[in-house]
Amino acid sequence: MTSRGRARASDRRARGAVVASGKIDFTDAGCFELPYAPVAEALLPEGPWKVVEGGVCAAKGFKVAGYKAGLRAKGTRADCALIVADEDATCAGIFTTNIMCAAPVTYCKKQLAGKPTARALLINAAQANAATGDQGAADAQATAEELSKSLGVAEEDILLMSTGVIGKRIKLDKLMPAIPILSANVESSTAAANAAATAICTTDLVRKTVAIEVQIGGKTVCMGGMAKGSGMIHPNMATMLGVVTCDADVTPEVWRNITSRAGAASFNQISVDGDTSTNDSLVCFASGKAGNAKITSVDSAEGKLLEQALTAVCRGLAKAIAWDGEGATCLIECNVSGAADDEDARVIARSVVCSSLAKAAIFGHDPNWGRLACAAGYAAPVKNRFDQNDLKLSLGPHQLMDKGQPLDFDAVAASRYLKEVTGVHGTCVVDISVGNGSGRGQAWGCDLSYDYVKINAEYTT
């Protein structure tokens, strides 16, 4: 290739893999190079669904695109994504509980409070647009207005997400010219879905996508999701963005209810480092294109099955985020049983996966039952405190405690279990029973390694 040819190739990469025809090449390795591991698929709970291809394009009625606008300080990876519904889609969202919420979070909450449908979601990486004051809000408004013009849809049908460095405003000089290109290139393909899932990532090591189909009311309903997140992950929404598309026909009230419950049982049950971010958002769309009879009750058989499917997708994505925790060598799954109710069980499970001492012990292959029991004991807020004499605790196949006291277990074998799990980036299972109640709960986290400190000492958030 001549020097001029190399320059032209380089220029194409710099412009986000747009070829001469104006089409984005979603297979361009320079922009969409983030590797994929089928973690979310592998971590899906069992159920009456099957995994399919397509990511957020698996559901009927949606088109997507990813693009490199030049928002990142370095590197060639794409940095913005667009999801567009063919028609008004029922929409629900849950957002960060951090008081310092970002401008796009405030914008989305206002939009969804005004109407239960949306047409498009624009996501940018690199700049979080958090702690940016009135100008940050104006920037969000400006991007929504530009997207509204490009797509020919009402501004109130636009939603926004941002992720990246807190305190940094969006580079409008880069993003605004990219919006018409994104709008012109949305398509319903696996390649486009993968490109979008890659574009939204920051410190993630893998892109996170999953899609399933399930029979509801005699019709095939498809549901796909993508998420990003690796650090600043903590219950009640963390530095994670999640998007789910679904083609079920469902009322806004039912969709809001099951989105809230699915989020509570998934994304709000993960922790990497105990930091709750400014930007966390989960937005779920339902196009109604599956042809099923409209689901009008959460208590109907169809409503329950739809909730199970949405929870499964959200759990697969949430667990993939914890698996990909910064510096992590394993996923930690804590299962709690015997609590007074499910919420108490969830609180206890969250407490265990949030414990820095427990996480460090697992990284060091130390079957330290004391740290695990301690974390269960200080869990708060719980409505009903358990009796310490009822505590049973197991690490994988090794029971470490019974009736609140340590057992004479094989410490070498238990340590070997941890070494084997971390050696293959597998799942370390912690089972805890706190009594005879009916409450059950799960939470997911990851171990705490030297690399976590290194990554966050070198990366500005």
From Swiss-Prot:
Kindly list the places in or outside the cell where this protein is found, as annotated in its UniProt entry. Plastid, Chloroplast
Q: Which organism is it from?
A: Ostreococcus lucimarinus (strain CCE9901)
Q: Which Pfam families match?
A: ArgJ
> Which family, according to the similarity comment?
Belongs to the ArgJ family.
Mention any additional remark.
This protein may be expected to contain an N-terminal transit peptide but none has been predicted.
EC assignment: the record states 2.3.1.35, 2.3.1.1
Cellular component (GO) terms are: chloroplast
Taxonomic path: Eukaryota, Viridiplantae, Chlorophyta, Mamiellophyceae, Mamiellales
Task: Describe the protein's quaternary organization and the partners it interacts with.
Answer: Heterodimer of an alpha and a beta chain.
Annotated substrate binding sites = 202, 228, 239, 326, 456, 461
Its GO biological process terms?
Answer: L-arginine biosynthetic process; ornithine biosynthetic process
Sorted UniProt keywords? Acyltransferase, Amino-acid biosynthesis, Arginine biosynthesis, Autocatalytic cleavage, Chloroplast, Multifunctional enzyme, Plastid, Transferase
Name this protein carries in UniProt: Arginine biosynthesis bifunctional protein ArgJ, chloroplastic
Catalytic residues, chain numbering: 239 (nucleophile)
Involved in the stabilization of negative charge on the oxyanion by the formation of the oxyanion hole, annotated site positions: 163-164
Q: What is its main location?
A: plastid
Q: Name one GO molecular function term.
A: glutamate N-acetyltransferase activity
The entry's function note states: Catalyzes two activities which are involved in the cyclic version of arginine biosynthesis: the synthesis of acetylglutamate from glutamate and acetyl-CoA, and of ornithine by transacetylation between acetylornithine and glutamate.
The metabolic or biological pathway listed in the UniProt record of this protein is: Amino-acid biosynthesis; L-arginine biosynthesis; L-ornithine and N-acetyl-L-glutamate from L-glutamate and N(2)-acetyl-L-ornithine (cyclic): step 1/1; Amino-acid biosynthesis; L-arginine biosynthesis; N(2)-acetyl-L-ornithine from L-glutamate: step 1/4
Catalytic activity of the protein = N(2)-acetyl-L-ornithine + L-glutamate = N-acetyl-L-glutamate + L-ornithine; L-glutamate + acetyl-CoA = N-acetyl-L-glutamate + CoA + H(+)
Q: Where is this site: Cleavage?
A: 238-239
